[in-house]
Amino acid sequence: MSRQDVQRLLEEYQLIGELLSSLQAQHATVAELLEELTTALDGVRLLKGEGGERLVHIGAGLFVKGVFEAKEVLAPLGAGYHAFLDLNNAERILQERIEEYSKLKTSLEENIEKLAERAAQIRQALERLGIR
């Protein structure tokens, strides 16, 4: 293996490391969004349920106790806009977003796995050459 080949492997290894860091940060963000969406979906489903007193998560581990007669929720539409949605539409939209972000999370996991495998291959090749 020529010196240029070794240099290319080292550069590729460094680039893969940077890409992995970026993808892992994106994965963490998507996982947090999924958790938030799931919590919101649970809250909407609670509001759709029979009347009576209940605890509803309002974020940051906080819950509010009370009797809720809400038939609509204020939901973000994007670009700073919000709209009131009936509970069925809110539930549908949340489910769609959860599905979308779940697919993205799976895709990120697959890409992370592929890059990690390539990094391991390069690391092994470099170790065989006595480079660490």
Curated annotation (Swiss-Prot):
Protein's cellular compartments: Cytoplasm
Chain's role: Molecular chaperone capable of stabilizing a range of proteins. Seems to fulfill an ATP-independent, HSP70-like function in archaeal de novo protein folding.
InterPro entries xref list: PFD_alpha_archaea, Prefoldin, Prefoldin_subunit_alpha
CDD domains: Prefoldin_alpha_GimC
GO molecular-function terms, A-Z: unfolded protein binding
GO biological process, alphabetically ordered: protein folding
Protein name: Prefoldin subunit alpha
GO CC aspect terms: cytoplasm; prefoldin complex
Top-level taxon: Archaea
Keyword line: Chaperone, Cytoplasm
Signal peptide positions (record): none
Pfam families associated with the record: Prefoldin
Family note: Belongs to the prefoldin subunit alpha family.
Complexes and interactors: Heterohexamer of two alpha and four beta subunits.
